[in-house]
Amino acid sequence: MLQTFPRVAKCVRAYSSKPTLGPKFQSLDEIKEYIFKDTISANEFLTQSERAKDRELPVPPRETVLKLLKLSGLPTKGADIERIQRNLSEQISFINILHDTDLDDSLNVKYARLLPRENATLSYGDLIVRANSGKNSELAEISGSWDSTSRASMRKDGYFIVREEFLDNRD
């Protein structure tokens, strides 16, 4: 059995828009614990009546869960099949409720995004002006502040090769 996993790291969600890397996994048990840990339940988004409908749905059979685990590359031995069956049932119920939800067709779908979609169209002249205007220091766009290929001294087939030891001691 492997003792360390040097290239596997935890991705921890700390209520921010950017994920952060946690410490490396040290054992296979840590990886299993992280993968099988419940993070969010679809029931949090359902009303009481929708949760009641959820209990009426059949639970996926054990054979189906085992096939899904094999397809996803997760271990079947030691897996909590009953918990996975409950989670799959909740997720299927949630998807069914989303499909059955009536939508208001009078709403414009382009406003259903986090960011506004009212972008002004750019002409060729606008693009040329922006390209020639240089970097905006207010947006932290400083010319020459970052060279993406500075650590790559070798090339092969038109690609730069960055050695891993150069990535460890970056400034």
UniProtKB/Swiss-Prot annotation:
Q: Single GO cellular component annotation? A: glutamyl-tRNA(Gln) amidotransferase complex
What EC numbers are recorded for this enzyme? Answer: 6.3.5.-
List localization entries.
Mitochondrion inner membrane
Family per UniProt?
Belongs to the GatF family.
Its quaternary structure?
Answer: Subunit of the heterotrimeric GatFAB amidotransferase (AdT) complex, composed of A, B and F subunits.
Miscellaneous: This protein may be expected to contain an N-terminal transit peptide but none has been predicted.
HAMAP family noted in UniProt? GatF
Question: In UniProt terms, what function does this protein have?
Answer: Allows the formation of correctly charged Gln-tRNA(Gln) through the transamidation of misacylated Glu-tRNA(Gln) in the mitochondria. The reaction takes place in the presence of glutamine and ATP through an activated gamma-phospho-Glu-tRNA(Gln). Required for proper protein synthesis within the mitochondrion.
The name of this protein is Glutamyl-tRNA(Gln) amidotransferase subunit F, mitochondrial
Record gene name: GTF1
